[in-house]
Regions:
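PLP-dependent amino-acid enzyme catalytic core
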Residues: 1-311
Length: 311
């Protein structure tokens, strides 16, 4: 019998899909291989680190039975933590900028989490500061700290990276991933680079907030990447190239994936695929396998400009 005893056991082992229609439409000679992380039970790649960070805190004796998990997040990590907390009997307090989509708020509340909103203009730093303030005044509480927690990239190194390597039979030429905490790129990238030192690693950040590429931060509409500060868990030395993506390009690409590939993916997925397509269009990558991370589902962005479609 193959029956899980906890929703946590359903996290990971997500599928990979080649975007054949997208390749043909855009006359790409490379293979775009998407790691579709919306297949996680909470709908995003962040389910992985939610479980990984909670388990690390439990093993370290920092998270005790009946304890409270507090986390600043742009949304998906909060949803994943709310899900894991519900399954393990913890209280979750999620701190999020009020500029994030209403669907994200509703999902966290549906899992039983308490939601604290901070001013969107303060970005993720405002949420981080508020989370630390709440932790100081809440008994038996911890901030798991995705931006600084080594369990974040370690989880991807232990799970996502090996899955990609196995599913491609080790034939990975390029990895393309957005930078939010940097944990996804760092964990997967370090694993792949160890297996093949020639793997090219491409980071994706907002055109309106090119902090990594130009040292300039600003407001933007690509929810989930571009935290406007450089996270501690990001290993910048792994990055070979940084591609900035405009909001309209991310939105348009996301809509195209839904309409022509049947994959309803989120804003940062659109951004990552657009960036991957720029790499794939280069003659030197003809015939190469370009792995692109699709962090979440588009269902949590239906109220945003991305899917503001006139009937």
């Amino acid at each position: 019998m193959r029956i899980a005893k906890s929703v946590a056991e359903l996290i990971g082992r997500t599928p990979m899909l080649e975007f054949t229609h997208f390749e043909q439409t855009h006359c790409l000679n490379a293979h775009l291989l998407a790691k579709v992380e919306s297949f996680n039970p909470g709908g995003s790649v962040k389910d992985r680190i939610a479980l990984g960070m909670v388990e690390a805190a439990e093993k370290a004796g920092k998270l005790l039975p009946g304890g409270t998990i507090i986390e600043p997040t742009s949304g998906n990590t909060g949803i994943g933590l709310a899900m894991v907390a519900a399954a393990r009997g913890y209280t979750a307090i999620i701190v999020m900028p009020d500029s994030m989509s209403v669907e994200r708020r509703q999902l966290m509340l549906a899992y039983g989490a308490k939601l604290v909103l901070t001013h969107g203009k303060l970005g993720m730093k405002g949420a981080v500061d508020k989370a630390n303030e709440l932790a100081a005044e809440t008994p038996n509480a911890i901030v798991v700290g995705q931006f600084v927690n080594p369990a974040n990239p370690a989880t991807h190194r232990a799970t996502t990276g090996p899955e990609i390597w196995a599913d491609t039979d080790g034939q990975v030429d390029v990895l393309v991933a957005g930078i939010g905490t940097g944990g996804t790129l760092t964990g997967i990238g370090s694993y792949l680079r160890e297996k093949n030192p020639n793997v090219r690693i491409v980071a994706v950040e907002p055109f309106s907030s090119p902090l990594l590429s130009k040292g300039v931060a600003g407001p933007h509409g690509l929810m989930g990447i571009g935290a406007n500060f450089v996270p501690d868990v990001l290993s910048r030395d792994l990055i070979d190239e940084i591609i900035t993506v405009k909001e309209d390009d991310a939105y348009r690409t996301g809509r195209e994936l839904a309409a022509h590939e049947g994959v309803l993916a989120g804003i940062t997925s659109g951004a990552a695929v657009w960036a991957a397509s720029q790499v794939a269009a280069r003659p030197e990558f003809a015939g190469k396998n370009i792995v692109v991370i699709l962090p979440d589902t588009g269902e949590r962005y239906l109220s945003t400009k991305m899917f503001a479609i006139n009937e």
